[in-house]
């Protein structure tokens, strides 16, 4: 048994082939996959090393990959985890080391995937003939998952379910909202997962002041009569689950919150029924019309792709659309989070429900097992 989760050689070869095909279409002779501070998934997708402080992976067809990492003390662990790469310290300056490598390999053109800073991009542009942004191409490579990726996402979903279960055990009158985060993370850290997100909103049902979970927990005590909404994702080696739920605290749901959640449940059912291979993104938006028919709207995104990033299609409703509906169709193997955050138009009250699922020939299927519904705690 490996010390760290790993994909099979066949899966990594599939990715490598897709990357080299992308490079050929873009007309580049080298690829830089770059990541920093945990951002930049291409590094891990190709090499299996999750970018820590900084990582630069140089890919040249016919040559061994070179992975430059920062800081120096990260080098031993990167050598244990990275697959099929010559792992080196990035030196005092990673871009300088990268430019030296490019010079040795014969610099012509460079494709880039990842969040390079402006100054880094400028220096690389001065060192090579052509720099081509391949971020959009990387996103396309991540849209359709392999069977092994679905298995990894299923494990992430299992750990996310466990996190929400632990959070509900902690959500009692008198508990600090910040303790919910501790309970959430405690459910999956020992299994090798880390926090992707845990967002909470706690407000009084009788006088609601929050319609969507927040990114930072307040120093507030939970009280009987509160409503708790959450959005939780456990990250298991580059793949995250996502579960959204609403709970009431030591009190039954008020008629108002029952109506909100009823609309959210109806929207969830209509949206998931509309998702199938070949369905256009506009069909999914149309299915959400039950929300407006009930007199409500949304704040959070309605649907988004997931598994390797926050992926297309990112959709809203007709009453809350922050961007044009993309001209794209659903494909078998995609993963989509369906998450109707049904709220009042004054943005004072709202509920969350939904979860991540994957698409096969028959349609959308949940990867989570946590029960649905508006549930009373205590």
Stretch-by-stretch model annotation:
Residues 1-378:
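Active-site neighborhoods and metal-handling regions in enzymes and metal-associated proteins
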């Amino acid at each position: 048994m490996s010390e760290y989760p790993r994909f099979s050689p066949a899966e990594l070869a599939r990715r490598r082939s897709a990357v080299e095909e992308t490079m050929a279409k873009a007309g580049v002779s080298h690829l830089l996959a770059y990541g920093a501070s945990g951002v930049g998934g291409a590094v891990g997708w190709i090499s299996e090393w999750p970018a820590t402080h900084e990582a630069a992976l140089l890919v040249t067809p016919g040559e061994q990959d070179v992975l430059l990492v920062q800081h120096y003390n990260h080098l031993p662990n990167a050598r244990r985890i990275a697959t099929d790469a010559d792992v080196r310290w990035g030196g005092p300056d990673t871009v300088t080391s990268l430019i030296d490598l490019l010079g040795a390999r014969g610099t012509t053109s460079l494709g880039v995937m990842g969040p390079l800073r402006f100054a880094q991009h400028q220096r690389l542009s001065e060192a090579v003939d052509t720099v081509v942004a391949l971020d959009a191409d990387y996103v396309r490579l991540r849209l359709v998952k392999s069977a092994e990726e679905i298995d990894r996402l299923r494990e992430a979903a299992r750990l996310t379910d466990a996190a929400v279960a632990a959070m509900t055990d902690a959500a009692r009158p008198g508990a600090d909202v910040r303790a919910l985060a501790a309970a959430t993370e405690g459910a999956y850290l020992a299994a090798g997962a880390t926090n992707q997100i845990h967002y909470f909103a706690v407000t009084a049902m009788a006088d609601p002041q929050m319609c969507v979970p927040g990114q930072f927990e307040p120093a507030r005590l939970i009280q009987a009569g509160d409503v708790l909404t959450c959005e939780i994702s456990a990250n298991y080696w580059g793949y995250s689950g996502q579960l959204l739920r609403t709970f009431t605290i030591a009190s039954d749901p008020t008629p108002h919150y029952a109506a909100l959640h009823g609309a959210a449940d109806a929207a969830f059912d209509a949206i998931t029924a509309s998702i199938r291979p070949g369905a256009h993104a506009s069909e999914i938006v149309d299915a959400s019309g039950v929300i407006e028919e009930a007199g409500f709207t949304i704040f959070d995104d309605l649907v988004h792709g997931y598994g390797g990033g926050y992926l297309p299609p990112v959709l809203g409703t007709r009453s809350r659309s922050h961007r044009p509906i993309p001209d794209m169709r659903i494909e078998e193997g995609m993963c989509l989070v369906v998450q109707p955050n049904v709220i009042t138009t004054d943005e004072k009250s709202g509920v969350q429900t939904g979860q991540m699922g994957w698409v096969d020939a028959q349609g959308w299927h949940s990867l989570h097992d946590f029960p649905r519904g508006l549930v009373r705690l205590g």
